[in-house]
């Protein structure tokens, strides 16, 4: 008997998942997509399997704007295990070396200013970055170490929350592309004892914070009781990840031409940059960029059904 193909639903919006430990970001996405029975889905940048916390999952029209969430600043809390270095820079790897820990809170806090502001980081070998088309983590698993170029990242805030024995709990606000494993390893090296990430929790991704997330267990429980449609109440609006952007509302006439791909004028527009756009009914219709001539050029449009 031929297997009946599951007919997926058109679902538009963002679910803010509190990713559980042990899941890859893609595994978490596919699980939630299955629960929602959604046609189209994508996530906004990977969290390590070890990590938990804020993982925005985009569905339908929201996938068109996932890149902008990928580019957003992030916030983390991490536990640095002092005195132990590992192959991966976190608790998933094999122990490379153990050293005595002779430093305390004053020594750690004295070093933190070195990591604040714009700094250079060398990405870890165990990362999804590619070298000649091959992910670095695959090369690392094969025992290879390749040269990696240092990259500029910005640490807006770095605080020591607690020091319990040989574990330092840190809070970090940072730009995209920041590797917390590298930050912890570099701190451990300066302390002279080495360190690795024992725990990692993402607390913020762009405008989204941990308090707004839902767990996989909560989604599964609601699905078991009410099916896929019952999960729609957890969906955030398609443009919720762009809420910090300037908002323009077009007239019916301007919206019509803009949705045909034509730049239009908006007297209240900023002088430059990206904007999100609503039609005369307050419906989000896409994002645009202010051109040199002051007109708003469409960059990503959503399907309005009109």
From Swiss-Prot:
Enzyme class: isomerase
Keyword check for Isomerase: yes
EC number: 5.4.99.25
CDD domains: PseudoU_synth_EcTruB, PUA_TruB_bacterial
Active site: 48
Gene3D superfamilies: Pseudouridine synthase, PUA domain
Gene Ontology BP term (one): tRNA pseudouridine synthesis
Pfam families registered for this protein in UniProt: TruB-C_2 (PF09157), TruB_C_2 (PF16198), TruB_N (PF01509)
SUPFAM superfamilies referenced in this protein's UniProt entry, alphabetically: Pseudouridine synthase, PUA domain-like
Catalytic activity entry: uridine(55) in tRNA = pseudouridine(55) in tRNA
Record key words, sorted: Isomerase, tRNA processing
GO MF annotation: an example: tRNA pseudouridine(55) synthase activity
Coiled coil regions in record: none
Keyword Lipid biosynthesis recorded: no
Protein's job: Responsible for synthesis of pseudouridine from uracil-55 in the psi GC loop of transfer RNAs.
HAMAP family in UniProt: TruB_bact
Family statement: Belongs to the pseudouridine synthase TruB family. Type 1 subfamily.
PANTHER family the record matches: PSEUDOURIDYLATE SYNTHASE TRUB1, TRNA-PSEUDOURIDINE SYNTHASE
Name of the protein this chain belongs to: tRNA pseudouridine synthase B
Organism of provenance: Ectopseudomonas mendocina (strain ymp) (Pseudomonas mendocina)
Gene name of the record: truB
């Amino acid at each position: 008997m031929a297997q009946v193909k599951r007919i997926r639903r058109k679902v538009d919006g963002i679910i803010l998942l509190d990713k559980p430990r042990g899941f890859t970001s893609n595994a978490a996405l596919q699980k939630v997509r299955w629960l929602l029975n959604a046609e189209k889905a994508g996530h906004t940048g990977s969290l390590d399997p070890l990590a938990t916390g804020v993982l925005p999952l985009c569905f339908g029209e929201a996938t068109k704007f996932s890149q902008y969430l990928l580019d957003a600043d992030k916030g983390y809390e991490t536990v640095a295990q002092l005195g132990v270095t590992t192959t991966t820079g976190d608790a998933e790897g094999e122990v490379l070396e153990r050293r005595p820990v002779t430093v305390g809170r004053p020594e750690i806090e004295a070093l933190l200013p070195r990591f604040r502001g714009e700094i250079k980081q060398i990405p870890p070998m165990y990362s999804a970055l590619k070298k000649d088309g091959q992910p670095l983590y695959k090369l690392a698993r094969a025992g290879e170490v390749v040269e990696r170029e240092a990259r500029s990242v910005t640490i807006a805030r770095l605080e020591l929350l607690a020091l319990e024995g040989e574990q330092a709990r840190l809070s970090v606000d940072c730009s995209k592309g920041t590797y917390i494993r590298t930050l912890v390893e570099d701190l451990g090296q300066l302390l002279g004892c080495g360190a690795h990430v024992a725990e990692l929790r993402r607390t913020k991704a762009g405008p989204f914070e941990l308090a707004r997330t839902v767990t996989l267990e909560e989604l599964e429980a609601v699905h078991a009781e009410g099916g896929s449609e019952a999960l729609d109440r957890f969906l955030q609006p398609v443009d919720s990840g762009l809420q910090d952007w300037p908002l323009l509302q077009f007239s019916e006439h301007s919206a019509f031409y803009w949705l045909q791909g034509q730049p239009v004028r908006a007297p209240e527009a900023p002088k430059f940059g990206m904007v999100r756009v609503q039609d005369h009914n307050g419906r989000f219709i896409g994002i645009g960029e202010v051109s040199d001539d002051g007109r708003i050029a469409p960059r990503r449009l959503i399907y309005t059904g009109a």
